[in-house]
C-alpha cells in the first residue's frame, strides 16, 4: 500500500517564507549571551562592587525617606547599659491604624532590667515587645527611630521567642523550637543582650509552661547586675509567686 502525504498550500508557503525561525532566534540569543558573558567576566569584580554600593545607596535613600515621612527622631547611642524610649511607636502598626497609642520604655540599672507584661489577649503585649526590639535594632543600623526620644545602649545580640511554627520536615514541634530558642537565649546571652519572650509556655500544659517560664526568668534574675535586658509577656497571671522575688526582692524586676 502506498501512502501519499500532501501539504496544504498555506502551510507550505509559511514553511518556505519563515522556515525554522524559532531555533534561529534561540541560537541568536545564545550568541548574544555568550558575547555579553565574555565582555563581563574581566570586569566581574568591579561590577559586583558597583552593585553592592548601589544596593547600599538604595537602602540609605529608603531609610532617609521613611524617617522624614514618619517624623522619626535621631536616637542617642551610648555605652551605658540602658534602653530609654520616650513615646515609642511600632513602625508598621502605626501605619495601619489611626489611633495608635505610643508607649515609653525604660530598662536600666537604675530602674529594672527584667520587665514582665501580663494581660488579656489582644491587649497589645506582643506589639509592644516587637516595638522595643525594632527600635533598638533600627538605632543600631544607623536609622532614626519612631519615638519622641531614645537613649539606646549598645547591644551585642537580640534573642527572641516571639512566634513559632512547627517544622515537620525536621520533626520539631512548635514547643520544641520554643525550648531551643529559650535555651540559646539563656546560654549565649550576655549583660549587653536584649531578650524578647512572648507567651512562652503555651505549647504545653499550663502547669509545665508556668514552671518553665518562671525557671527561665529566675535564671536571669540570679545573674543580678549581669542580667541582660529582658522583656516578657505572659498570660500566666500567677507568675509572680513563682519567682525568686516572692521571698527575695530584686531591684531588677518590674511588672
Which residues make up each language-model segment?
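A conserved P-loop NTPase coupling/switch region
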Residues: 1-53, 79
Amino acid at each position: 500500500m502506498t501512502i501519499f502525504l500532501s501539504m496544504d498550500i498555506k502551510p507550505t508557503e509559511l514553511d518556505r517564507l519563515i522556515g525554522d525561525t524559532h531555533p534561529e532566534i534561540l541560537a541568536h540569543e545564545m550568541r548574544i549571551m555568550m558575547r555579553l558573558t565574555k565582555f563581563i567576566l574581566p570586569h566581574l569584580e568591579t561590577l559586583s562592587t558597583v552593585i553592592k554600593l548601589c544596593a547600599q545607596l538604595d537602602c540609605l535613600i529608603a531609610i532617609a525617606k521613611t524617617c522624614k515621612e514618619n517624623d522619626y527622631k535621631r536616637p542617642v547611642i551610648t555605652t551605658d547599659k540602658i534602653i530609654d524610649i520616650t513615646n515609642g511607636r511600632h513602625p508598621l502598626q502605626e501605619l495601619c491604624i489611626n489611633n495608635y497609642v505610643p508607649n515609653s520604655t525604660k530598662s536600666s540599672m537604675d530602674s529594672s532590667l527584667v520587665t514582665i507584661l501580663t494581660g488579656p489577649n489582644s491587649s497589645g503585649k506582643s506589639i509592644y515587645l516587637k516595638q522595643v526590639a525594632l527600635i533598638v535594632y533600627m538605632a543600631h543600623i544607623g536609622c532614626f527611630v519612631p519615638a519622641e526620644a531614645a537613649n539606646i545602649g549598645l547591644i551585642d545580640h537580640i534573642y527572641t521567642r516571639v512566634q513559632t511554627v512547627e517544622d515537620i520536615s525536621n520533626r520539631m514541634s512548635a514547643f520544641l523550637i520554643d525550648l531551643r530558642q529559650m535555651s540559646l537565649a539563656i546560654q549565649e546571652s550576655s549583660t549587653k543582650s536584649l531578650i524578647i519572650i512572648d507567651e512562652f509556655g503555651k505549647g504545653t500544659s499550663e502547669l509545665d509552661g508556668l514552671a518553665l517560664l518562671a525557671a527561665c526568668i529566675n535564671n536571669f534574675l540570679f545573674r543580678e547586675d549581669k542580667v541582660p535586658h529582658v522583656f516578657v509577656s505572659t498570660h500566666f497571671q500567677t507568675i509572680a509567686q513563682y519567682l525568686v522575688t516572692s521571698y527575695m526582692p530584686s531591684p531588677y524586676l518590674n511588672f
